[in-house]
């Protein structure tokens, strides 16, 4: 074992051996209480069972992103386990928008729904819930979003923070899963797997109970156990990387692209068992995902005329609103400048946009500064969304670029672990993986190789990428680092991560380069 690397990892994560044992000790079902840790969860279960006792109609109202899909599927499957039929609805991004609406509340009343359960939404649906309650409809909110000081007048609210379960934010599907524990009085492996997927897809902090659930699900996952998950991940191992790069994007693609109520087929996919029908669903999911890739690449390429002397990218595209964040993200990753991509709404009068920015630029603060040009905005430091009148586009663009010019990007210095070329091996990879799963609030360790001689590097045939074999099954890989730029320096420092890459049955341990900097001595 590479003791030096292990010690460096302990320092990197600011933990001692006790902390290491805590994050690596086995987790099992006993780590999860049967729901009683949430305030009022037993009363909420009793409410649901009281409605069931006289065959009352129940509607589960979810959301169009992966967390909303997983949360809705958890609850629908939970009811299937007890053979109780329920109705469910995932809103369409373009026709319904986010969350329970007044229109859908009125439809629920017309359809004699007795109980509405919102999942991954509801905490801000004041008026729709007031309408439901005024007509005697019971409401249970299962949500995780930040609440306002005043809460909706639901019968019960199950929420990780508000219900005093803990202090770490979690996902809607995790919260729904915890409700299923209290309802079923047992731990269900499939439902826990759906919840674990949502922790990664919704970028929840991978600490505390979030980490425990994800670790347990990954450790106990067996191929060919759950057809739906196997079909989504294909031949990849089930872990946080596969969830983030394979599974979640496919689920989210449906909500990004599909019009009408076809998105509800996703819940059927995750909760039904007919093999031929499931094969039809996965074919559809893969087809939509390929369309998502093609559409976002096409839109990104059409906007790809950035000049290095521009401090920001602000463009209007005809791409669907659900793709704007992906397109903006691609451009930010390529050019490392703030980027806003907008598209017209159906009326043509409004522009809806998505903003992404590199570290060091605060998106939501920029929107606050320019709020007089915006009809609505929201988000956080590195990502946000906005709506503006089309007539204000040119002045908004000019003012945003002006603001970026006046706000030089502050390079955020990240902790790194210095290693040598000989440390790029399977043993080092195994030591690092012991600290996984990696994600929000627990990133994969950033590694650095100092003073690499550029004359020792090999490049792809088109000389755009670093592809250097350094051992029988180890190599340096860096995409979009052209020879012409790299070899302007005699020595460079490399920053990146260790990963395992399997291609045509051959396994390589790669140092995947994310950044290079000159280490030539002046």
Enumerate the language-model features and the residues they cover.
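A short acidic, amphipathic alpha-helical/loop segment
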Residues: 127-132, 327-330, 431
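Short, acidic/hydrophobic/Gly-rich beta-strand patch recurrent on exposed beta strands
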Residues: 315, 466-472, 511-514
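OB-fold single-stranded nucleic acid-binding module
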Residues: 392-396, 488-522
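Conserved phosphate-handling catalytic cores of large alpha/beta enzymes
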Residues: 109, 118, 123-133, 137-204, ...
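Hydrophobic helix-and-loop "lid/oligomerization" segment in the mid-to-C-terminal part
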Residues: 2-115, 135-136, 153, 184-398, ...
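Beta-strand/loop nucleic-acid-binding surfaces
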Residues: 471-486
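Accessory interdomain/linker segments of ATP-dependent helicases and helicase-like nucleic-acid enzymes
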Residues: 417-470, 476
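Non-transmembrane, aqueous-exposed alpha-helical and coiled segments at domain scale
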Residues: 406-412
């Amino acid at each position: 074992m590479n003791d030096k690397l292990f010690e460096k990892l302990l320092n990197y994560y600011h933990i001692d051996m006790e902390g290491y044992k805590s994050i690596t000790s086995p987790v099992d079902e006993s780590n999860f209480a049967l729901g009683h840790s949430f305030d009022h969860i037993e009363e909420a279960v009793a409410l649901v069972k009281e409605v069931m006792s006289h065959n009352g109609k129940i509607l589960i109202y979810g959301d169009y992103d992966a967390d909303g899909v997983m949360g809705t599927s958890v609850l629908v499957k939970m009811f299937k386990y007890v053979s109780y039929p329920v109705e469910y609805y995932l809103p369409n991004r373009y026709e319904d928008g986010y969350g329970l609406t007044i229109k859908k509340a009125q439809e629920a009343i017309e359809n004699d729904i007795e109980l509405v359960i919102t999942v991954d939404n509801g905490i801000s649906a004041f008026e729709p819930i007031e309408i439901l309650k005024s007509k005697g409809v019971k409401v249970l909110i299962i949500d995780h979003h930040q609440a306002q000081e005043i809460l909706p007048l639901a019968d019960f609210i199950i929420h990780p923070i508000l219900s005093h379960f803990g202090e770490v934010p979690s996902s809607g599907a995790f919260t729904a899963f915890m409700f299923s524990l209290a309802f079923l009085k047992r731990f269900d492996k499939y439902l826990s797997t759906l919840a674990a997927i949502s922790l990664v897809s919704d970028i929840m902090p991978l600490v505390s109970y979030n980490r425990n659930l994800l670790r347990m699900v990954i450790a106990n996952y067996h191929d060919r156990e759950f057809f739906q998950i196997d079909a989504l991940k294909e031949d990849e191992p089930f872990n946080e990387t596969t969830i983030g790069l394979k599974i979640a994007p496919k689920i989210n693609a449906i909500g990004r692209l599909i019009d009408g109520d076809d998105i509800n087929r996703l819940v059927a996919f995750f909760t039904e068992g007919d093999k031929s029908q499931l094969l039809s669903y996965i074919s559809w999911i893969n087809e939509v995902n390929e369309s998502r890739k093609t559409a976002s690449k096409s839109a990104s390429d059409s906007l790809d005329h950035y000049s290095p002397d521009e401090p920001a990218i602000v463009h209007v595209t005809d791409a669907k609103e659900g793709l704007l964040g992906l397109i903006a993200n691609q451009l930010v990753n390529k050019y490392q400048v703030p980027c806003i991509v907008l598209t017209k709404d159906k009326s043509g009068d409004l522009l809806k946009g998505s903003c992404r920015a590199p570290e060091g630029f605060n998106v939501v603060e920029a929107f606050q500064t320019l709020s007089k040009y915006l009809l609505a905005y929201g988000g956080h430091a590195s990502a946000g969304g906005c709506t503006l009148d089309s007539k204000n586009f040119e002045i908004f663009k000019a003012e945003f670029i002006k603001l970026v010019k006046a706000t030089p990007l502050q390079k955020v210095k990240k902790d790194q672990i210095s290693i040598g070329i000989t440390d790029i091996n399977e043993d080092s990879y195994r030591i690092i993986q012991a600290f996984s799963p990696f994600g929000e609030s627990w990133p994969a360790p950033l590694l650095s190789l100092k003073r690499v001689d550029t004359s020792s590097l090999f490049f792809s045939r088109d000389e755009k990428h670093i592809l250097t074999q350094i051992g029988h099954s180890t190599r340096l890989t860096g995409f979009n680092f052209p020879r012409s730029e790299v070899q302007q320096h005699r020595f460079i420092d490399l920053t990146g991560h260790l990963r395992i890459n399997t291609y045509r049955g051959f396994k390589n341990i790669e140092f995947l380069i994310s950044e290079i900097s000159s280490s030539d001595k002046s």
